[in-house]
């Protein structure tokens, strides 16, 4: 199947022009696009073209390209292109409304499932595993973008393509042998030679200079010899599949037929209403940003991440609807946020233990699925009966692999729950920031209102340094009330608050430690009760 079977107005020359144009946007000083977002954006275009069954007109192709690049930035970068920039860079070909509708259509076709492992992901993993030379890695990145000019990459598995690119890159950079015999390597070389000197498509030449490997390439190319080989790639594209999801996309009619029962909350994100839909009461969360016709980052990430989740301690997303910047998310209805449950007091020791274990079970599930929540607070944990559910994934971040460091924002986590590395402005960080926030939450469940007090970062840092010491254990005041009533639990909390994230236990280990702690307490309680009964019987 050809990529353009359903789109007779599109062709491969147009695609080359589009890719070259998108790569040149990478050099615009007014925007910041990561290498990963550039690659993801290009691959997202092809995935969309493959999945879209409605014929795409020639005029819309450029708009699709820039919108896919913008969506890739929203998922992976700290800054986005934005609809205004997309309109500007397209020289007024499209209005904001047209671009907004294109974005809506692309999201609809993908069913909001935009996460996929691209070739760069595997190149990075191979580079880390094999500890390859920086020049080899940079050259492999250039080669990846070079081969994206053609659609042959769609006919071979992503991981296999990454391995072939890395092997060719190691050969090109390090091998003094001037003859290429491997057919795939011959293909890579001919593509490199074609685009590095192309009179019209200048982006690869610019990238090579940007990556500081142009001189290396220029010196190597004239000396390499090879025999022409037939195309080694299949003509058949490997089928592209969507993420599995039990979540439905609401229609406009369904949304209009939802009866609002009461307002549950309002904030900077928008509002949450209790509504009735299909004879079921749900919570309808609405993001309504001012003067924006595009989906905001928080909404995109929230839906993208939640469609992958299915766990009793994670809030369930029933459905969603998006149009012209406004996003509606249908969520499982719960009784109240955790902080209200705690404010009521009178939680039994067993319920406190249950909440702690459930919190850790939910967090373990998130981290196992490569999601960092980044905003765990007692407002973002809900209670339904005696069940605890983690909610609000607007700040969450999907991590393709824990070994790969992404572009992360420091503007995450409510300040009182914010890990010390973020307060100190240290990048990069990882899922261990959730362990710190979780420690603060566990302390709340046990009865400590806030572990660290303060209205801003400076005051919270001062509180942390006063209670925990400026270095681990030095001059620590500690949590005296917690230690008095919950000595064993407090020692675990201290471990979760280690200043060095690498020393903090992961969610799986914290769950294990708390479970063992609670089992030991139960056994001790049973033994004490038995001893008391025996003494009474003797007397």
UniProtKB/Swiss-Prot annotation:
The active site is at 375 (proton acceptor). Residues 1-115 form the Cyclin N-terminal domain. The keyword Transferase applies. ATP binds at residues 264-272, 285. The keyword Mitochondrion does not apply. Its EC number is 2.7.11.1. InterPro entries: Cyclin-like_sf, Cyclin_N, Kinase-like_dom_sf, MAP_kinase, Prot_kinase_dom, Protein_kinase_ATP_BS, Tyr_kinase_AS. Keywords: ATP-binding, Kinase, Nucleotide-binding, Serine/threonine-protein kinase, Transferase. It is an enzyme of class 2 (transferase). It catalyses: L-seryl-[protein] + ATP = O-phospho-L-seryl-[protein] + ADP + H(+); L-threonyl-[protein] + ATP = O-phospho-L-threonyl-[protein] + ADP + H(+). PROSITE patterns: PROTEIN_KINASE_ATP (PS00107), PROTEIN_KINASE_DOM (PS50011), PROTEIN_KINASE_TYR (PS00109). GO terms for molecular function: ATP binding; protein serine kinase activity; protein serine/threonine kinase activity. Residues 258-519 form the Protein kinase domain. Belongs to the protein kinase superfamily. Ser/Thr protein kinase family. This is Putative serine/threonine-protein kinase L670.
